[in-house]
């Protein structure tokens, strides 16, 4: 389960909580439903069942529990290093969206933390008041310019993805310093980010388990989350009635 999938688990739980308080949720989410392209739903449900019923409880969740019990200075330091590696890609992607202010923040955070923060281990820039902007992936840039998701796919271990977001991820991997990381280093980064995000979702497990259709909830949360990010957190409430909940969840990850 990758970071995006773990984040979607958090968002799904948030949406489930919102649904309990909003009987008209189905009508309010129609705009998101119209964007969902799930031609492989039968296959995806099988993969979801394997990921959720086998890989998560026997592999990912135990790792996440261990991670959550690791001393905070260690997990925070690792999280800072991994996040620092993504700063240049976010800077470029914000520039591509015509948002130079956010791009400059990401660029400055990268060189300051890389130089004075032990290659990002310590968030010196954040301590100086330069708070991190939301990460921007090239897939989000494509969404910003109206490119559709493409078909939704769920695979064992890797989790959920769409062509737009994964093609965007390939583009992001060409930016320095991500382009300098070895294949095994990239796998380690991906795994650590997934475990870290899964640890953040541990207290949401019961909500997802209690859903009448966890696959649909999780899938819809994926699209809600991506749309919320692309909109810069400014999605109209008619399209995203859980905007505050989503923002709170995303803030947990950031």
Identify the function of each model-found stretch.
Residues 84-163:
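Mid-length scaffold segments of soluble, non-membrane domains
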Residues 1-7:
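Bacterial N-terminal signal peptides that target proteins for export
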Residues 78-79:
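Beta-rich strand-turn-strand
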Residues 16-18:
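C-terminal motif of bacterial Sec signal peptides marking the signal peptidase cleavage site
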Residues 27-34, 140, 144-254:
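A structured, mid-to-C-terminal "fold-capping" secondary-structure block
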Residues 27-54:
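Post-signal peptide N-terminal segment of mature Sec-exported envelope proteins
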């Amino acid at each position: 389960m990758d970071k995006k999938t773990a984040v979607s688990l958090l968002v799904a739980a948030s949406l489930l909580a919102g649904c309990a308080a909003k009987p008209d949720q189905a009508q309010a989410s129609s705009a998101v439903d119209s964007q969902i392209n799930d031609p492989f739903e039968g296959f995806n449900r099988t993969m979801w069942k394997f990921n959720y019923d086998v890989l998560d409880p026997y592999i990912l969740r135990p790792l996440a529990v261990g991670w959550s019990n690791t001393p905070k200075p260690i997990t925070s330091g690792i999280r800072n290093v991994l996040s620092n590696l993504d700063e240049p890609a976010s800077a470029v992607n914000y520039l591509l969206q015509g948002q130079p202010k956010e791009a400059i923040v990401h660029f400055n955070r990268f060189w300051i933390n890389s130089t004075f923060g032990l290659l990002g281990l310590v968030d010196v820039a954040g301590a100086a008041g330069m708070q991190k902007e939301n990460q921007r992936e090239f897939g989000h840039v494509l969404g910003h310019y109206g490119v559709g998701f493409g078909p939704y796919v769920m695979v064992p271990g890797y989790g959920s993805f769409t062509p737009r977001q994964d093609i965007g991820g390939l583009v992001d991997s060409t930016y320095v310093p991500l382009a300098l990381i070895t294949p095994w280093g990239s796998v380690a980064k991906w795994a650590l980010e997934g475990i870290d995000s899964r640890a953040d979702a541990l207290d949401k497990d019961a909500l997802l388990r209690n859903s009448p259709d966890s696959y649909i909830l999780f899938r819809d949360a994926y699209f809600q989350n991506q749309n919320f990010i692309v909109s810069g957190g400014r999605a109209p409430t008619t399209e995203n009635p859980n905007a505050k909940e989503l923002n709170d969840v995303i803030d947990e990850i950031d």
